[in-house]
From Swiss-Prot:
Transmembrane segments: 6-26
Name assigned to this protein: Alpha/beta hydrolase domain-containing protein WAV2
Organism, scientific name: Arabidopsis thaliana (Mouse-ear cress)
Catalytic machinery residues: 159, 243, 308
Pfam entry (one): Peptidase_S9
Recorded name of the encoding gene: WAV2
UniProt tissue specificity: Expressed in roots, rosette leaves, stems and flowers.
Chief location of this protein within or outside the cell: membrane
Knocked-out gene: effects: No visible phenotype under normal growth conditions, but mutant seedlings exhibit enhanced root wavy growth and curvature in response to gravitropism and phototropism.
Cell compartments where the protein resides: Cell membrane
């Protein structure tokens, strides 16, 4: 009996040790997936394929990494709001072009699509601190442009992009007018137990019962729950209730954390929305929700205001 129990104990311990070793060695490959299986790192299409007016933008992050982006306008002199768009963790910005094409039509906006370092045509390798620098470089570029209304820059982020957007919005209260989060997680620490269930006993955020013994090994914790609590700008939360990747209660927790300090928070649920298709399954309600938010919190300047 003792031998059996000992074998069971050591067997379980071996599994945990092996799992932790894999986490330490390959965690970036779990969090950041620039290349989808069976596809190449390059863009399968460009905005030109969808007859969109765009610029190829090359930026340099503060640590010297060369970044690529697309700046897409509804028409050359569009002075509507500008959406700074942050994608999920997998694939590249070309895979979001169809959604962005509809976004431009429905919201009458410009869209700036950034390729994180290591994604698409951008150089370097993805990391949390690196991507935070990349996002700042994109915002600084937009803030310095003279062909857009820089008082109407709104950050949009889905999943990982929401974590990126939350940090950027928190750090730039004078440059970002509002934030839109869609199907975003509370933290990678909380997601570890979702992706690898045995890790929930060892890795977790402040709101979990995890022992948190291994939190220190996570190099990209992306604590959205902490960033959201410090944001003073308006925030729209878009939650797909059929999200198969990020449990929908993550969005509810983010909203509760934000709304406790920020009265300009709006939470909208989409009953049939999954992780990637909430914008599609939500139909006109989805776009109307976004449009109303922009009209309220990133409104067009009145002529008397611009004349002052």
């Amino acid at each position: 009996m003792v031998t059996y129990v000992s074998a069971l104990f050591y067997g379980f311990g071996g599994i945990v040790v092996a799992g932790v070793a894999l986490l330490v060695a390959f965690q970036e490959k779990l969090v950041y997936v620039p290349v989808l299986p069976g596809l190449s790192k390059s863009y399968p299409i460009t905005p030109a394929r969808l007859n969109l007016i765009y610029e190829d933008i090359w930026l340099q992050s503060s640590d010297g990494v060369r970044l690529h982006a697309w700046f897409i306008k509804m028409f050359p002199e569009c002075r509507g709001p500008t959406i700074l768009f942050f994608q999920e963790n997998a694939g590249n910005i070309a895979h979001r072009l169809e959604m962005v094409r509809i976004m431009i039509q429905k919201l009458k906006c410009n869209v700036f699509m950034l390729s994180y370092r290591g994604y698409g045509a951008s150089e370097g390798y993805p990391s949390q601190q690196g991507i935070i620098k990349d996002a700042q470089a994109a915002l600084d570029h937009l803030s310095g442009r003279t062909d857009i209304d820089t008082s109407r820059i709104v950050v949009f982020g889905r999943s990982l992009g929401g974590a990126v957007g939350a940090v950027l919005t928190k750090n730039n209260p004078d440059k970002v007018s509002a934030l839109i989060l869609e199907n975003t997680f509370t933290s990678i620490l909380d997601m570890a137990g979702v992706l690898l269930p045995f890790l929930k006993w060892f890795i977790g955020g402040s709101g979990t019962k995890s022992l948190k013994l291994l939190n220190f090994v996570v190099r990209s914790p992306w604590k959205t729950i902490d960033a959201i609590a410090e944001i003073k700008q308006p925030v729209l939360f878009l939650s797909g209730l059929q999200d198969e990747m990020v449990p929908p209660f993550h969005m509810k927790m983010l909203y509760a954390k934000a709304a406790a300090r920020n009265p300009q928070c709006t939470f909208v649920e989409f009953p049939s929305g999954m992780h990637m298709d909430t914008w599609l399954s939500g139909g006109e309600v989805y776009w109307k929700t976004n449009l109303q938010f922009l009209e309220k919190y990133a409104p067009e300047k009145r002529k008397e205001d611009t004349g002052r």
